Amino acid sequence: MALLSAPVRRRRSRVRVLLVCCCLLLALAAPSAAAAAAGHDYGDALAKSILFFEGQRSGRLPAAGQRAAWRGDSAVSDGGAAGVDLEGGYYDAGDNVKFGFPMAFTATMLAWGVVEFGDAMPPAERAHAADAVRWATDYLLKTISHPGVIFIQVGDPTKDHGCWERPEDMDTARTVYNISAARPGSDVAGETAAALAAASMVFRDDDPAYAARLLAGARSAFEFADEHKGAYSDDPELRAGGCPFYCDFDGYQDELLWGAAWLRRASKEGTYLDYIQNNGKTLGAEDSTNEFGWDNKHAGINVLVSKEFIDGEVLSLQSYKEFADGFICTLIPESSSPHITYTPGGMIYKPGGSNMQHVTSISFLLLTYAKYLSNSSRTVNCGNVSVGPATLQQLARKQADYILGDNPMKMSYMVGYGDRYPQRIHHRGSSLPSIKSHPQRIACNDGTPYYNSSSPNPNPLIGAVVGGPGEDDVYEDDRADFRKSEPTTYINAPLVGVLAYLVGNPDPGQGHVRH
């Protein structure tokens, strides 16, 4: 049914040269007096951004500690169609499918946020964040536990998106998809390696045995990715299952570098440094892009790898610092470089829908790169202007504040934060009566009246950040408009790190651009 159509995933957009009006420059240069006076409760937003993941859980829920109490067990037999155990993990968005590619990216970004900014989190929230990482990595370890294959998806998205039903009720096919030597998927395998390696750093101190298991899994997944090169969506069967939702539009090469970069960061082993140095040009490290997300990792690779050069540890990685600088310059309106689009209200904008994924992921890179630069007193030269860490921090803060309510709509785009936020998000479990209050089954088509209802969702998915407004800063609270009203795990995952930074640095101060 058209009205129940699945989210149309985002194609890569190219950098465009745009003129930014003076009012936008002023908006980015300093917060408004009202915003500065009011401020935001970053601690509350952080807690809720992590809580969101408990509403996305698949599988048997914990007997104690499940705070999204309106959810119940679901998909407990996942993997049965292939004779394996694939219970667990996360539903990617407002549907009931487990897509391995974006789930692994979600885990990577959650882990990276804890690695970089976990010290700024209150202890309870750091523990919740680690739990969110573990829920994903426990599942990812299952996907790589059978020799010769990696399982990359559970659920038939076409059939799933034809129904509006709770995950606890779903009866659509739980088709299992895998990659192998015969049908490679370096993209998913490489991202899985990155996720497991990054997560190993989260648990290194508190659970070294689990951390070692994660790192071993990361090595195995990376070896698979590098030995069997190819994009999973090039295979007709896998393409039918994953596309148009999560096709690999940008190729698998970036995920190979991304996986190697995270294995280098986590293990410090020279093997992975050699891989990065020897294969960077071949695998497109110098690709110029101002995008970072589940499909395109180039900007993230350059920021991550540049750390060793910035810290003075590996001077041969200078080119990655140069590439990272180039990415940063595309975000600075005053720069003469071709740069990203900002809405009149100051939001980073890229066409295609679910725009907040770009806002949160780019904001995370801004803060992470600012941290690296600050540690070595470096700046970024953008030709006609020079920018320092404070400018990057202020720009990221503006984006976070936009999400939390400093925007033309005067509303928060995080469910449960502030006085005004989305009430009708595109999310099956949130929009249907809870299994706890309505234990009777709600079948596939029986959920349609709830989809069409103008009433607020009965189960607020606290912490969910929706796709957000378009280039005109306008947001209609419309469940049917999935491009704007649907939350995803990969919107929230980078935001956790952003908010953690802001908890520790509630007022980053004014950034100054030197001409």
Swiss-Prot record:
For this protein, the Enzyme Commission number is 3.2.1.4
> Does this entry carry the keyword Hydrolase?
yes
Q: Which SUPFAM superfamilies match?
A: Six-hairpin glycosidases
Q: Which residues are glycosylated?
A: N178, N375, N384, N452
Keywords of the record: Carbohydrate metabolism, Cell wall biogenesis/degradation, Cellulose degradation, Glycoprotein, Glycosidase, Hydrolase, Polysaccharide degradation, Secreted, Signal
* Database matches in Pfam families: Glyco_hydro_9
Which top EC class is given?
hydrolase
As one GO molecular function, the record gives: cellulase activity
Q: Show which residues constitute the signal peptide.
A: 1-29
Gene Ontology biological process terms, A to Z: cell wall organization; cellulose catabolic process
Organism domain of life: Eukaryota
Q: Does the keyword Signal apply?
A: yes
From the UniProt record, list the reaction(s) this protein catalyses: Endohydrolysis of (1->4)-beta-D-glucosidic linkages in cellulose, lichenin and cereal beta-D-glucans
Residue pairs linked by disulfide bridges in the UniProt entry: none
Q: Where in the cell is it found?
A: Secreted
Q: Name one cellular component (GO) term.
A: extracellular region
- In which family does this protein belong, per the annotation? Belongs to the glycosyl hydrolase 9 (cellulase E) family.
Q: What is this protein called?
A: Endoglucanase 23
Species annotation: Oryza sativa subsp. japonica (Rice)
